[in-house]
From Swiss-Prot:
Annotated protein name in UniProt: Lysophosphatidic acid receptor 2
Location(s) in or outside the cell: Cell surface; Cell membrane
Gene symbol of the encoding locus: LPAR2
One GO cellular component term: glutamatergic synapse
Transmembrane annotation, as ranges: 31-51, 67-87, 101-123, 144-164, 186-206, 240-260, 277-294
The entry's keywords: Cell membrane, G-protein coupled receptor, Glycoprotein, Lipoprotein, Membrane, Palmitate, Receptor, Transducer, Transmembrane, Transmembrane helix
Amino acid sequence: MGQCYYNETIGFFYNNSGKELSSHWRPKDVVVVALGLTVSVLVLLTNLLVIAAIASNRRFHQPIYYLLGNLAAADLFAGVAYLFLMFHTGPRTARLSLEGWFLRQGLLDTSLTASVATLLAIAVERHRSVMAVQLHSRLPRGRVVMLIVGVWVAALGLGLLPAHSWHCLCALDRCSRMAPLLSRSYLAVWALSSLLVFLLMVAVYTRIFFYVRRRVQRMAEHVSCHPRYRETTLSLVKTVVIILGAFVVCWTPGQVVLLLDGLGCESCNVLAVEKYFLLLAEANSLVNAAVYSCRDAEMRRTFRRLLCCACLRQSTRESVHYTSSAQGGASTRIMLPENGHPLMDSTL
């Protein structure tokens, strides 16, 4: 093992990798932070709504929805991690300690790994449900919990490894350009792992598609339901294309630049696009909520109920304030909405 540089500054490693460390806010930095903060806030709000919907509706207390809830939790964590990054980027990067830098990177790696791993778990669970011809899988809750725990153990493992061993503090020639404190091999392994997850998802959803198509074709041979057969097939194709297309659009650019940097491509200008591709990967945490949750009719109804309930409470508070003011300090306040009808708790 060569000399270790545990007492050096962040600037030392950035200079070693050839990555510019800005001393002031450039227009590019401002644009990235503005977009990043916007995406992070949307990710937080959207996934909080998904978690609230799953927790409040007993119909969602099924294994597949537990996995959707875990996906929302992972994406919520990703929003927090990216928000932390936005407050510690640009000129503020130079002021980070080595521990602070590894914390910033570890939060991102852990949350994004958990999100990707949960996508694969959902695909496997859907495959199991379809093959068992069940609307909702009867997978025991204990096994679902073990699956979720496994996802987070793997995510924490990949997220914590760089800070403890998989770094380049003792081998400067192995440092990556995109993440100057990380080993290039770590980036390559992370990119290849994400690519493997995508290929497994393609295989699983392709098998689901052909299985369902064969079953519907058999039904169509015995029952006059050709329009329904066509509708079911097109709906399934649409779902598969949306799921895989969203993953490709959001993750492929980032995976490519990570792999190129991990393989040591000196002629590849990965630093010019890394921030935007990372933002695109973070946007996947917003897309997941739309693809996996908002396409569910019952989930949409629960969203409307939660949002309307919040609006109704706000309207009630305003009505109470107006009524109490009009009565000039009377001790009895009448709680009526603007239409004059009694309020009904929409959660019942």
